[in-house]
Amino acid sequence: GHDSALCLLDTEQKTVFAMSTERVTRIKHDFLDITPIISEYKFDSVDYVAHSYNDFEDKGHDGELREKMTYNKDIEKAIRAIIKPTYIKDLNVSRSEKNKLIFKSLFTNFSAVKAYYGAKFKRALVKESPEGNRQAFTNYIKNNFNKYNLHPKEVFFYEHHLCHAIPSYYLSPFNGGEALALTIDGQGDGFFSKLYAFKSDTKYELIGQSSADFMGSGDRYLSIGRIYNYFTQAMDLRPNSDEGKIEALAAFGKADKDLLAQLKEATLIDKNTLSINYDIAKITPFYDIDFLKQHRAKMGDKNFCAVVQTYLEDTIVDYLNFAYEKYPISNLCLSGGVAANIIMSLNIYERTNFKNIYVLPPMGDDGLAIGSAILTALEVGEDVSWLKDYTMPYFGDEYTREQVKTTLDEF
């Protein structure tokens, strides 16, 4: 995944500490594990640890819980010890440049080079199985905590989209009452969207889901979020990071009717199962960067961006209107990376019957840390009803007024 984060839920003190890895490493949307946070902050004890994926069979072909991924993390740590990046752009080095840096480090940072090739060798020997994947990740997580004298009793694994939905409800004003919770992202555990109906904080059910079917190569998954990623890439921007620029530029354009119609014809909403599906033959061109760039050149940047933004708005509005027909509940919780699209949220408010909408502030994968922590607390029988009293979404560092004043006085 991306946007790794840590959330420490103290059910005795009724406190929350949460932080994204990028806040420590300064690598935007950092996909490394949470060890940079653990090394920077002191934690007295950790009873349980949870992870926000549980597809050990890799049915969704996202590779998140394959044993080889644990070695990929070790390889990444070794590379960073060699490159010493300050920002994410520093990681964009060519293969030849990387090899030169590795060779140079043979004489200046041999331990990092040894760790790099050691992890690559071990990765090559892996023979993956669902049981092996689970054990490998459990060991990887425990070993990383043990390095900092933290010894969790157990490691839990929860479904990706449930980890999005749970905090969007528990941290919302609707906690304890009825609400629908929609998750929408690129993909996770084989799906790009799920819809839950909450009756209360102890009773909820899955009422709709949309699968992110793998299209056979690279990062091509059938998904609204992934399509938006491809438009971002066609604009020569960074996918999973610069989508907000597409959303902003779209406001100055007008969607090309033909291309928008082509997108919509490839998209099918089943109002009975509450799922969003695709005609593979019709949607495939939208995963071709050359195809998209040709249309970008033809209609201009603003209108090109307006196509995918309008498509997103109309598709989600139509989907939620069908959902409301079956489940007429006026409260809606939104989470998942696509929920960062504020104009989509505005359209939901203006064009559906949902009157009260809550968007989880850490709507992306960083919010999964909070969701998995809440699910763990519930599983071990802890009370988390106090979470509804948290009205501010800031769970990181705290500073006193005196500390703030002292810093300001320095300027």
Q: What positions do the PLM features span?
A:
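Short acidic/glycine-rich loops and adjacent helix/strand connectors
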Residues: 1-411
